[in-house]
Amino acid sequence: MEHVLPGQAPIRDFVHHNTLHGFQHLPFAAALEEAERLTGIRGYLPENEFRALHRKGRIDDADIDTVLDRHLGAAGEEILAVAGGEPVTRRQIHRLRLTVDLEPVDPARFTWLVDELEALDRFDPEVSPEARRRLMESAKRGRGEAVASRRLVRDLWDACLERLGLGDYTASHPEDLLGHAIAHAEALYADFKAESSGGGLSVSHRAMREEARALLAEEIDAVGREQTLRGFILKLTGQDVLDRVRPQLIRHCASHLDEGLAAWHSPDRSLGFYAAWKRSMRHGAEGGLGEVPLGHAELDALPDDPAEVVVFELEQRGIPLPYWEGYLERLALELPGWSGMMNWRAHRPLYRANRTAPVSLMDYLAVRLILDRRYLGRICSETWGIGGHIGELARYFEAHLSEFVVRHALYCGDLPEFLAATCADLVRRAGCERVDRKPWRVAADMIFSWRHAPGAGRDLRIRLHGSGWRLFKLAQHLGLSAHDVQALSASEIERLLCALDELTPAQRGYLWLCAYERHYREPLFNALASNHGRGRWATRDERPQAQIVFCMDDREEGVRRHLEELNPAVETLGAAGFFGIPMYWQGLDDAEPSALCPIVVIPSHEVREVPRPGEEAARRLHDHRRGVVRLLGRVFNQEIRRNLLSSHLLIDLVAPGVAVGLIAKVLLPRWAATLSRWLADLWMPEVPTTLALHAADDAAPAGPEQPRPGLTDAEQADRVAAFLLNIGLTQGFAPIVVLMGHGSASRNNPHLAAYDCGACSGRHGGPNARVFAAMANRPQVREQLAQRGLVVPADTWFVGAEHNTCSEEITWFDVQDIPPLSRIGWHAFAAQLDEACRLSAQERCRRFASAPRRPSPARALRHVSTRSVDFSQARPELGHATNAAALIGRRSVSRGLFLDRRVFLISYDPTRDPEGRILEGILLAAGPVGAGINLEYYFSTVNNERHGCGSKVAHNVTGLFGIMEGAASDLRTGLPRQMAEVHEAMRLQVVVEQTPEILAAIYRRQPPIRELVGNGWILLSAIDPGDGTISVFDPERGFVPWAGAATDMALCGRSTDWFEGHVEPLAPALIAV
């Protein structure tokens, strides 16, 4: 079941991942179709949004033509009809099907289009000028004179209906058509009465029963495969049992999973969810006061083993054994957030919260099934006087088919108002068919006759508002006049209309996506080809003034670019932000260690932050005062909510201060944050710290099961050497080498971890940078590196730092250890980095709606800094929004390009990796990280309400592990709308500087890479290290040369010249180097 449930961790440990991780073994398009079949969630942007992107120029005609040619091949040139002397090909029809809304319309919308927009007298607004011209010229030739556009369009409509044999309805107002259905239904019912007066059943009634019997069998068979009993009952009563179950179930789930928000906890949490629930129902008020109380005898009868409960409940419902798995899967998907969290915790028994509250998905399903049975049984008993067994329901409705028809049509169908009102009144008055059979039979026969009435109901909608409307719009966009339509043969019209449905909605979505991706990919490839040979540091012939290794994060692309523009002698590199140091980290104030590494890695070592020698007294004072702050926090956050006496006193006491603080946060957030930071520093002065990272050479072996404090000299040298080799930094070391981790800081932001470093399990990467620098500076490590042929000059000093991607602040670590000779160079570099951050803030402001237009760098920095401390700000930063590509290679490939902060930059030197072994490791480590980020943003963008978690405005934090909307919603997973609203939903385009042959060999060797690349979850291309030629990977053909060609590009003196004044995504541009 894990493959269909959300795999999101608790929100404090948020790590980006593929939302459809359970379908990753399938090709991308097939996976989206299978997920939609199972969950009903579409995996592409709505077509109207794609069409809006086409109108804006984010997708152009060449993109659409290219993907259609690839999809159709030679079949696209097949001639379907000859109209107006011109052939109409399948490719033309498919192209119009993509770019124009050619869906059938329902009668109500048709009425609105005719009455309000005069759709039968005016051209479709989206008809191109060329098509209008052809249409008007054709009409003039056909009539021998010019025709007014209103008359021309009306004639076209009449001609379409005439060719489809619908001419009888051209003069009728759509609302009048309802009268045909009513009259026909009444006539059929009169026949029924006449035929049945002789004691038999009418022909129409017998037909209705046969149709009903088939539908009933279909619905019964779907229980366990496509729906649960809840869905079946919902279709027949309009009552959703989940509305009654959800509040009770969620209350218990939230209490059991709580990680620190609740003031009280159940004393039985350690027994597991099911056992704790049973005890709560027995001893708590809810067991006796619930809407459907569970008595002690019934609770005692329940097995202690939740698995036995699940088996018992499924048998009680009459679900066939082969359908059990599907039934439980459907049941879990009715509340996927809560089911997914239970499942996530169940698969991670070592998770810290499981120590006091173990979790099992079987526990959850057992409780859900018990509650379902109680409420389903009540509905069935009150409505039909039977239990909630699928067999009883089947037998009842087999004997009362008329009632089944009426109820199913009322709650699932699209009945006209006169029939819906009749059926609703019947359900309300009669209750069920066993009370009075006649009115149910009358209503069922009327429904049947309405559905099968010629010229009315569904038949008319399919033909008039379907074929007629679609042919009418299609003719306009093809430039066909009434004369041209009348000249078409019946077979030609049929071929044209059939061609409109040859592309399924999923296929159209995939074609649009491919066109969207191509529109981004072609300028990117053009930029890389045009930039070949321009960038510095391809060979590092001269020594850089400074080197800085950033995380591969796309948000760092802008800072790197601005820094290089400020000082071309600086070399920037990129890598996964844990810097090759997987570890458990425990900061000075941390209660327990946290893993700082990719989520798939389990660390074997632990590193602690400790006070520097001589700072013991400062540490004791710090701990004492921090203890006071924590005590006050517990009193304010929990005691005030649970103690009757103290809550009254404390509320009166703290209310004035809270009011003043709230006003300051709202009106003066920057000033309030500064004051708060000053008071915190005054009360708890910072303790100078160092790292406890060394372990003796004879220390016990380290492993994931028994993490060991510290690393030996050899282990430290192993990690430093491997990382430097991976990024290609094995010679040409600068005097200052900075390791720049990153994190994000903002207020009132439950999704804070989603802005942090994905390579550090959703936490800050500064500690990893600090640890790496400390290791690389140790003489013992340098000595071992030299023995391995990796010589680091004596005057090179590594410095750890952390970049706040929200406020653009830089935090430096252990600067007091920088040697005096290196300190001058570090000061100069730090000043340049600060200026680069100001320029980065200026670039970011162009995408914020509330930011000043064209701000100076200093003003832009103030703005982003204020956003980071404004607790009312729903968009403190935009995170990874707009990420679209990853570039693995030397910085010379991309240096000198404006990439709009959309590209993950990962350093790799192909000239030092002839067999691709280093690249193989990079792809295995960084590939899933980049793909996880990209795919989570993709799915949260295409359907934010289902794959994402909706707007932050309605979110409530639940138990410090998740968010809900209100107090009784599902647990929301994915990204909030404010994080994804500017994102362009497309798959990650990975470009690797290496030969296609080496990449193909890696692809064949590594199943994880084959799954991601071969199934199309990410897109792979190669750029040759020698001549810069680009090859694109096709899962069916392998690497094929890029079909495009380098064209002239804009050349700018600096990035500001390109982005200033623009708020939209920008294409790459060349920057002077």
Swiss-Prot record:
Cellular location of this protein? Cell inner membrane
Question: Keyword annotations for this protein?
Answer: Cell inner membrane, Cell membrane, Membrane, Metal-binding, Transport, Zinc
Cofactor(s) this protein cannot do without: Zn(2+)
Annotated Zn(2+) binding sites: C551, D553, H742, C757
Q: Name one GO molecular function term.
A: zinc ion binding
Q: Which GO terms describe its cellular component?
A: plasma membrane
**Topological category with respect to the lipid bilayer:** Peripheral membrane protein
Task: Tell me the protein family, please.
Answer: Belongs to the inorganic carbon transporter (TC 9.A.2) DabA family.
Function description: Part of an energy-coupled inorganic carbon pump.
Q: How does it assemble?
A: Forms a complex with DabB.
Tell me what this protein is called: Probable inorganic carbon transporter subunit DabA
List the source organism.
Answer: Methylococcus capsulatus (strain ATCC 33009 / NCIMB 11132 / Bath)
